């Protein structure tokens, strides 16, 4: 008996990603997404069947609306690296002569996206000889932050209307009115980045049922930045901090942490960990034949702090925010079940150099409007010069500095960006000017740290390539 082999259409999911028209008669689907991304964080072919075009809706007044969904607009090979094979939804609409084309999008934030979206829409508008209305979702969903920033582009590719990013806003655009250049606020990537992180924390907490958050304050720059973001997202009265000094914590770090909390209006509780360190030493000594030392002793300090943070967050029903950065996650300069403990890694997609840049901006006059918008102190220091200027240190042993174990962050981060985001390897890295010994060392560290990243808290994606669902590498790779 002959049995027909299943085709690709048979295997395709039955769902479509669609636009629905809602009116007095009810609702009906009027357009289906054609280009289904399956790269980075996107896996739409697993869930959806691609639609066919062109997608055109004629209104009762005779106006013809072209309809596209997110990736259907991303068909310019010159502007992006990830170009999907398949139909050209914009090209399909050209002979239909639409009056306006609308693109409904759920496009997650990264630092390069806002400008890229406008360039893609401008290219489409010039091809179609009609305005393009780009409408982007606003809000955080797990690791993704949808930053909004909707706009209208004229048939000649010029902006007609722009909405701010990372906030809900409704605006009316009259397609028959005389076009006017919109009021454009200065483009500030650090402003956009900070607002995206605040939105990500706010929505993650709200959607997970948390009203309050907790973090550990060390007096270092990473925890300081997370404290500022959390305060902006949730309010100072909803954020608590623990100071957990060890014998190796400097007086300056403790003072800096207390001063930061005072500037932000945060509650602080100090829990010295020396008694717990002594207890672990006494308990482990019979098994080890000596007190823990070296990296084991350093990791115990981090795990003691992680346990205290988890206990308080558990008891108080708080969201624990972990404070590690992308540079540390990349090379494994973090402690599993210690400083990695938490429900959300707020700056886990920020390289250390980006942390410094964002903190410098927060303490500059350029951040004043943003500080006012989030009810942060509108004058004076936020992070503080003492925190921004001190050499980074985990303070897990006497006189420890990050530079004892890691290369200079400017060299390390430049190499990590080429490895992770630009996907360069071997001769390409050497041609880019990276030190051969550093390349070999960092490549090995990046591979070996995968087991830690697999168990890390979810992080907020704010770069083109983040660790998380879009980063899929084996743990055991030889």
Language-model segment annotations:
Residues 1-216, 232-233, 268:
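Enzyme catalytic cores with a strong preference for nitrogen-chemistry domains
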